[in-house]
């Protein structure tokens, strides 16, 4: 059971009003990522929120939840029980790398779902913002190059 974080039915942000299902998705993501930090030491929840704000409305639920299945104990069944649609769960499955799956296979699989492609592109773009890292390491730059190749592929350009 996912612990609820109380929110009003609607939250007013600079992007307008957010329906309750997105409100619930934000609460679940905040709970799932509580205490996690990113590579820059910032609260991890800021990443899915940035991704959510960079996609069209129809992709926002999946965008804010995009790392929940991989990075928490929350399952697809839990999200289904919370009332999220099978369509949203299909997007979440497509943007979640499976155990033993190569990165290339994951990106190819993700590319087959139009909303997953949008969410993953936004995720990768946010992950490629090296300005958030004070002193990027060689590993950070290698990850950046890998993500840029995935962006090229997901945009429909040639696979590098």
Q: Which ranges hold each PLM region?
A:
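Active-site helical microenvironments for divalent-metal-assisted chemistry
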Residues: 2-160
């Amino acid at each position: 059971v996912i612990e609820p974080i109380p929110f009003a039915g609607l939250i007013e942000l600079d992007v307008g009003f957010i329906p309750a299902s997105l409100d619930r998705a934000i609460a679940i993501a905040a709970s799932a990522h509580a205490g996690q930090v990113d590579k820059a030491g910032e609260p991890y929840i800021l990443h899915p929120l940035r991704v959510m704000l960079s996609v069209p409305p129809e992709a926002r639920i999946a965008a804010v939840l995009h790392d929940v299945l991989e990075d928490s104990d929350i399952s697809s069944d839990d999200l289904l029980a919370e009332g999220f649609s099978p369509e949203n769960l299909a997007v979440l499955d497509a943007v979640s790398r499976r155990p033993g799956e190569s990165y290339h296979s994951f990106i190819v699989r993700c590319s087959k779902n139009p909303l997953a492609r949008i969410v993953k592109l936004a995720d990768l773009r946010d992950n490629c913002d090296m300005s958030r890292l004070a002193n990027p390491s060689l590993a950070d730059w290698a990850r950046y190059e890998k993500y840029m190749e995935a962006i090229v592929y997901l945009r429909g350009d040639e696979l590098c």
